[in-house]
A protein has these predicted regions:
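Non-catalytic accessory regions flanking glycosidase/transglycosidase catalytic cores in CAZymes
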Residues: 1-93
């Protein structure tokens, strides 16, 4: 069994806040909701997140494509990205 000793009287080094680098934004369809956006805004303000990753950008609830040979609709996708950028987040694609 390995053991480690910690001297609590010794001063330590500042910890790098690696958690501020990125937050997972869950599924893209959730980011269309006002309550989700408010929670994300608070999280960015309080925690200082810089990057956001999420999944489901082309999921059915984003309505990018829903008919064979039909047009593409990026309105919801653009709405999400515009909101992320307004918060100072860099969305990862």
């Amino acid at each position: 069994m390995n053991s480690k000793s910690i001297n609590c009287a010794e001063s330590g080094k500042p910890m790098t806040p690696y958690w501020k680098q990125m937050v997972c934004g869950d599924r893209a369809g959730l980011a269309l909701r006002a309550d989700y956006r408010e929670c994300l805004r608070i999280a960015v303000r309080e925690c200082g997140f810089q990057n956001l990753r999420q999944h489901g950008m082309f999921h059915d609830d984003m309505f990018v494509w829903h008919k064979k040979d039909g047009p593409f609709n990026f309105q919801y996708l653009f709405s999400n990205y515009d909101y992320y950028l307004s918060l100072g987040l860099r969305p990862l694609v």
